Amino acid sequence: MNLSDYILEFLRKKRVHNIFTITGGAICFLMDAFSRNNKLKYTSVAHEQAAAMMADSYSRFGPNFSATMVTSGPGATNLLTGIACSWFDSIPSLHICGQVNRYELSSFDKSTKKVRQVGFQETDIVSMAKPITKFAYQLKNENEIRYVL
């Protein structure tokens, strides 16, 4: 089982039934995993903020919490208003954002380069999301996924 399949299977076991998403290069492996998992449904939306608001509403009024999956850069930053909405009203939700390849990260190999100097659409979304979430984290390697989820 690869990491993308593991994430979707974890969400299924937590009774997440619908994930709101916009596809993008930084989450293409997660989107591919949907084709191998017929127990989860995803809803493709026109804007990431809509995905976050839909996840909030689904969690607020539905039987289970919901999630979003978006790509890096503007895809991630567009979630912030919806994340804040959930935060202010204590509505549970999970937001998974893609990021540039590990070797393109400004933090890779103790690089002295700043964010956005190496990777396409690299964004420090964790720093932006921390004030409006209970937990915001960027995986450093795939072995952390069990703890992070």
Task: Show where each model-derived region lies.
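N-terminal alpha/beta PP-like core and its mobile active-site loop of ThDP/TPP-dependent enzymes
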Residues: 1-149
